[in-house]
Amino acid sequence: MKTYRKSALILLLFAIFLAACAPRLPATVAPTFTVVPATPTSTPTSEPDPVSWWQDRVFYEIFVRSFKDSDGDGIGDFQGIIQQLDYLNDGDPTTHDDLGVGALWLMPINPSPSYHGYDVTDYTAVNPDYGTMDDFKQLLAEAEKRDIKVIIDLVLNHTSTEHPWFQASQDPESPFHDWYVWSDTKPQTPGPWSQTVWHRNAANNLYYYGVFWDGMPDLNYDNPDVRAEMLDVTKFWLEEVGVDGFRVDAARYLFAEGSVQQDTESTIAWFEDWRDFYKAIDPETFSVGEVWTNLQVTAKYSEGMDSLFMFDLAEDIKNGVYAADSARIVASYQDVLTYFPDGNFSAFLSNHDQQRVMSLYGRNVEKAKLAALVYLTGPGTPFIYYGEEIGMTGNKPDENLRRPMQWTDDARGGFTTGTPWQPLEPDFEEVNLALQNENPNTLLNHYRRLIHLRNAHPALRGGEYLPLSSSCRQVYAVLRLLEEDALLIIA
């Protein structure tokens, strides 16, 4: 039985869902959250379980190409990120004009023939568009000064067709031939979502397996040389470069077993061995996996990576806010906590593959604020997609989800002095960081307050998630509770 002692209770109020069950606010009132003293409550006296560093931080996803250009070539780079580190976190916990994030996830930084970088040509080098390895190490050093951790995208499943391994593998006599999956004839088995996965190679008239498209051939993880090589790649980035961990792309597809091409027992087992491998190098290494499927299947990977993205939860938060259906949000969190009771999962609203939140909400800032409140005060490790905090918009195709960051209202949005690699969103003159800095009621400052609140309260980072009953379905009410720290969130 738990024992309890008295503690102060912090109450968060947010006037969007509440407005559905009460008279509407005047148009001049800007919805925001308020922190006020409330009646004391009881909390457990038992010591909380120790948490890992990633459970104590808010992450920020950066597409390097689109974040900040330092040299005028129109392409974001490592030096550009360095220039903006103080915006992300100035390293001083007493200040509140930075965003307050504690870790960065950099989308692929390896050399690649594509703009996005998910078809790698060299696993132990950086994309020259972004700078040199020395530039990247400088970024790591500057981030460390501010207590910012840095993880990178690790594309384990496939390479580019331009990778030297694949080029060599086209020769059936090459020792690299079995690094990929080849067939003399075209198998008729469709891919996991009924797509074509066997692609003809003009150089040898054979067919190779690639689950995503013909420019990304899958590596053959049945080959022990491939498995050993990817362990060496992992070790390189941890020991020789010094990153803090990895976001694992396309984790579901490493091994096929007959006609089953995703979530096989061999894939799940490999990740468990991989985790043991990198923890032996540095127990503080962090990995988060992209396992884009339902919660039940995602949970099978929980022993192979430190955290996993909750795609169903993201949809339930966004759509629950859209429809003013708090019950959907609460039920989704409860489902996740059934499989991850320690809260060791990753929450987000959108990423580089999904419609931006502000586009979903039709530029409704109030709904964007509420969605932010829900996931930044909820359990799990939050991941913010760059530009989300200022309400950048973006709809498919993918290039439009990854446009340059909107820093100012000048002709190039403060992103570059040259020609941006991709046009900015047309609304950048009205939606930009410089403009939102000036008004305390903007989405940007709402994000700042929420992140700093989360940083200040252990209950938000690792406390119990206790939904409270309400006679109004539109009211979102939960208690976050950890030892003497308690927060009541009502929206």
Identify the function of each model-found stretch.
Residues P44-D49, W193, D232, T293-V297, ...:
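Alpha-helical scaffolding within the catalytic cores
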Residues G117-V126, D306-D316, N400-R403:
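Short glycine/proline- and charge-enriched loop/turn segments
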